[in-house]
């Protein structure tokens, strides 16, 4: 279910403040964040945001097609190792 239009999209205050300061200074720095639930807003376009996936921060360059998606969508948390080749114990 989508978020109500009466409410604004959720963006962590510390991340938004950092992005606004960088936009004023016209600088490009990597912004480190743990807030995977934050929604990408148009002010973030062109910045690189390092999103935590539980183990490390993955750098994500924000483009215009990413607007209205969450930061966590672009930082996968699970690494699929593949199915076991010869697992005869589980068949019994």
UniProtKB/Swiss-Prot annotation:
Family, per entry = Belongs to the universal ribosomal protein uS19 family.
MF terms from GO for this chain are: rRNA binding; structural constituent of ribosome
NCBIfam families in the record: rpsS_bact
What is a single Pfam family found in this protein's UniProt entry? Ribosomal_S19
Protein name, as recorded = Small ribosomal subunit protein uS19c
Origin organism lineage: Eukaryota, Viridiplantae, Streptophyta, Embryophyta, Tracheophyta
Q: Which domain of life is it from?
A: Eukaryota
What Gene3D superfamilies does UniProt report for this protein, alphabetically? 30s Ribosomal Protein S19, Chain A (3.30.860.10)
Keywords of the record: Chloroplast, Plastid, Ribonucleoprotein, Ribosomal protein, RNA-binding, rRNA-binding
Q: Where in the cell is it found?
A: Plastid, Chloroplast
Task: Please give the PANTHER family that the UniProt record associates with this protein.
Answer: RIBOSOMAL PROTEIN S19P FAMILY MEMBER (PTHR11880), SMALL RIBOSOMAL SUBUNIT PROTEIN US19M (PTHR11880:SF8)
The transmembrane residues are: none
